[in-house]
Each structure stands twice: as C-alpha cells, then as structure tokens.
C-alpha cells in the first residue's frame, strides 16, 4: 500500500525508458493491452474502460496517456542525448513490446502472413484485421504495432528451453559424471546427434510440457516426458525426439491458429534462437507440412522490428515495404518421404496428452 501510494505512474519498461529520454509519461495501445484495463474492440478508439479500471483497483490517474506505437513522442532531452552520445536532433518513437516487435522483425506483416518464434518459449501468430477470442484454444487477438491490425496471442511455455533442460539437467549437469558442465558447443553437438537419427526417432516421442501449457490447451498440471523408450533408445534418439516434440507442439498450435484465423497457412517465417538450426527448420517444415522460411539474423528479429517501426514512423517507408526489407536466408520445403511417419507420430503425440492429462492433474494438483 505504501509503494502504491507513493507511485505517480505505473509504466511498462520501455515506457520508463521513453520517460527518461523525453520526460513524457506515455504508453502505446499495444503495450498497455496486457494490463487488461483498456477497451480495444475498436482500434481507432482505444481507451481505459471504467469497469476494467475499477476491477483492477488502480487509479486511472496513475496510468500513462495512450498513443499509437508509431507516434513520435518528441525530441530527445539534451541531457539524455549527451549521456548516450547521440545527436540532440534524434526523435523518439513510442515503440512496441516484445511480441509485436518480433512480428514486424520477422517480415510477416501482411494480413494472415505467419511467423513462428522458437526461443525459450515459442509462439505462432499472424496479423489479422479482426478482433476475436477463443476460450477453446485459450487464444485472443491483441493490438499489434500496425495501425488497425491485431495479432493472434498465444504461447508455448517451453520450446528452446527443452534443449536447455536437456543440456543442464540431463547431459551436462555439474555433477560427479560431468563436473565441468556443458561445453560451449553443446547445442551444435545436439544438432549433430539429432541429424544422425532418422526422422521419427525410431518412434520415440517427447512431449515438451515441462511447466504446463498455455495454448492450444490451458493446462498448468500437464508435464513432459519421453514415450516409447526401449533398450535400443540412445541419447541421440532422445535429442532428436526433443527437436521433433517441440515441432509436434508447433503443429498443434498451427492447427489452432488456422482454425482461429479461418484459413490455411501454407508458409511461415521462423525467428528466434531455434531458427539458427537448419535441422530444426527442416524438421518444422516436415512436421508442419508447410514452407518454413529461415529469416536472416533470426535472433535479432525484435531489434530489427523496432528499427523498422521507427523507419515507418519517420516516413522513410511504409508497412507494406517491410516484407521486402527482411532477408530470408533459406527456405525449407516439406520432405514427402517423412510425411507418413510424422503424421503417425503427431497423432500419437496428441493421444499422449489425452491419455495422461488426468494422471498429471492428480499428481500435480498442488502446483
């Protein structure tokens, strides 16, 4: 209560930085959306909704004024320019949060053009010209940085983190067997191991729900595991199964996004740390049965996105020009030879969830 009473404004991290740069308290409609205090059903008139403000318990006077992500907030303060060593003539654009900036940096900015992010977590989304909520899939549209457009909001809790878990808790923990811990090239070794195993990992299935799942099912008690292990299962099989299990989960989400959007997605741009693996890109193309376009400098998609947003805001180019400004390093087509095994195992992947969800609910009911 004391902290609340002493607080003048509640700001998102980027909005605090903008305050230091310009002296202005401001937030963008897309950034404030996940505070659940705005009515964004009409993107031309986003405002703090009285009922939502009341439910939040926060005084509206403690919230910043609302703008568009593309608005120029103003010139940088002289002291900020001096501290940063940049020109005092620099303009400060309001900017956009993590997911929205990645969407722009992926180059998938047209309506229904999709991108897949594989990092610690993952998501698969596209811009759409409508607002919609799906309790079935635990998905809803959120305002994007592009005026008049929404993004389909969803998330997988653990994607690339499954490999981190494998590295730090299974293969290379600092214990009596591997006291030195993981080598610097651990992920490349994983990639090489996975490539040595045929598609389908000899029918070993990994489910990546290490801390539950959000979409296309909201289930905080489900947990991950390896299924169908045998005496012939090697750690190479386990590594490839992790690559494939994350991709099965991506396909599950893709199907939900397609149903939500009302159309098939035939190609998607892939970004994030996982996109640096050629093998993982190909596995995704095979399992999702669609073209996967590996964005160049995929890890920098978020930074590129805010840079491109600034370019639009300052009139250097238009949103429709962005896709041609984002380079595609390589395109991956589905391998028809892998279609049968991956379709079979994907069906069983979903069956594993149905067969085990009640068991996990009982086992993890206190979590």
Can you say where each PLM-predicted feature lies in the sequence?
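Short acidic, glycine/serine/threonine-rich loops at helix termini
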Residues: 21-26, 31, 40, 76-79, ...
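Gly/Ser/Thr-rich active-site cleft segment
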Residues: 1-97, 163, 207-211, 239, ...
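Glycine-rich beta-strand-to-loop/alpha-helix junction loops that act as flexible
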Residues: 69-70, 118-121, 267-275
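Short, acidic/turn-prone active-site loops that include or flank metal/cofactor-
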Residues: 32, 120-122, 296-300
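Glycine/Thr-rich phosphate-binding loops that ligate phosphate moieties of nucleotide
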Residues: 2-7, 11, 126-367
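Short acidic loop-to-helix transition motifs that present clustered carboxylates
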Residues: 68-75, 97-101, 275-277, 300-302
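Conserved glycosyltransferase catalytic-site signature
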Residues: 14-15, 96-101, 121, 284, ...
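Short glycine-aspartate micro-motif
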Residues: 10, 89-105, 113-117, 123-124, ...
């Amino acid at each position: 209560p004391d902290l609340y009473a002493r607080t003048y404004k509640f700001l998102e991290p980027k909005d605090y930085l903008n305050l230091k740069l310009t002296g202005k308290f401001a937030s963008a409609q897309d950034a404030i959306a996940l505070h659940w205090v705005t009515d964004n059903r009409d993107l031309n008139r986003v405002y703090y909704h009285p009922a939502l403000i009341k439910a939040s318990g926060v005084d509206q006077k403690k919230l910043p004024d609302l703008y568009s992500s593309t608005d120029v907030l103003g010139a940088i303060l002289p002291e900020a320019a001096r501290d940063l060593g940049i020109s005092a003539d620099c303009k400060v654009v309001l900017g956009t949060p993590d997911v929205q900036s990645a969407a722009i940096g992926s180059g998938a900015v047209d309506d229904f053009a999709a991108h897949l992010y594989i990092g610690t977590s993952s998501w698969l989304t596209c811009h759409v010209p409508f607002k919609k909520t799906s309790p079935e899939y635990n998905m809803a549209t959120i305002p994007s940085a592009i005026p008049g457009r929404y993004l389909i909001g969803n998330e997988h809790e653990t994607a690339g983190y499954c490999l981190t878990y494998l590295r730090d808790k299974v293969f290379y923990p600092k214990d009596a067997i591997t006291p030195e811990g993981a080598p610097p090239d651990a992920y490349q070794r994983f990639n090489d191991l996975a490539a040595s195993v045929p598609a389908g990992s000899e029918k070993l299935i990994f489910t990546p729900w290490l801390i539950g799942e959000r979409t296309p099912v909201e289930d905080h008690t489900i947990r991950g595991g390896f299924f169908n292990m045998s005496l012939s299962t090697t750690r190479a099989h386990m590594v490839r199964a992790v690559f494939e299990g994350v991709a099965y989960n991506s396909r599950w989400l893709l199907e939900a996004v397609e149903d939500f959007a009302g159309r098939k997605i035939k190609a998607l741009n892939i970004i994030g740390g996982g996109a640096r693996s050629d093998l993982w890109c190909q596995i995704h193309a095979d399992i999702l049965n669609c073209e996967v376009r590996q964005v160049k400098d995929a890890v920098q998609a978020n930074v590129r996105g805010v840079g491109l947003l600034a370019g639009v805001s300052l009139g250097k180019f238009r949103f429709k020009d962005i896709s041609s400004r984002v380079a595609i390093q390589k395109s991956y087509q589905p391998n028809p030879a892998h279609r049968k095994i991956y379709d079979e195992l994907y069906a069983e992947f979903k069956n594993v969830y149905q067969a085990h969800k009640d068991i996990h609910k009982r086992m993890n009911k206190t979590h």
